Regions:
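Beta-hairpin "wing" of winged helix-turn-helix
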Residues: 68-71
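Basic amphipathic alpha-helical segments that dock to polyanions
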Residues: 60-61
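Glycine-centered, phosphate/nucleic-acid-interacting loop/turn motifs that mediate DNA/RNA or nucleotide
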Residues: 65
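Short, cationic-aromatic polyanion-contact patches
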Residues: 24-29, 39, 74-91
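Polybasic "coupling" helices that flank or enter modular domains
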Residues: 1-46
Length: 91
């Protein structure tokens, strides 16, 4: 069994954003915002979570300054903050 499904939703969502859009984030560099196109519904289906749960996390990360949420997209402002979320619950 893939251990990804056992991780908490924040770690899974952060990992998905970073993996799915890693090339764009790497090309932009750590201090340049990157806008990623996807809907919260698409993310919820990929992660097996409710759209509402995804929305709550994205809004929390937005308040913390890691991302900026817009219609069918998000802008990654602080990729390192997302990387830390992926590592937080590793054994």
């Amino acid at each position: 069994m893939d251990d990804t499904v056992l991780r908490p939703l924040p770690a899974r969502l952060a990992r998905e954003v970073l993996q799915a859009h890693g090339r764009e984030l790497a090309a932009a560099g750590p201090h340049h915002p990157v806008t990623l196109r996807f809907s919260q519904e698409e993310m919820s289906q990929m992660l097996g979570a409710s759209r509402q749960s995804i929305n709550r996390l994205l809004k929390q990360w937005e308040r913390g300054g890691a991302i900026e949420v817009a219609y069918r997209s998000l802008t990654v402002l602080d990729p390192e903050a997302l990387r830390l979320l992926t590592e937080r619950d590793e054994g």
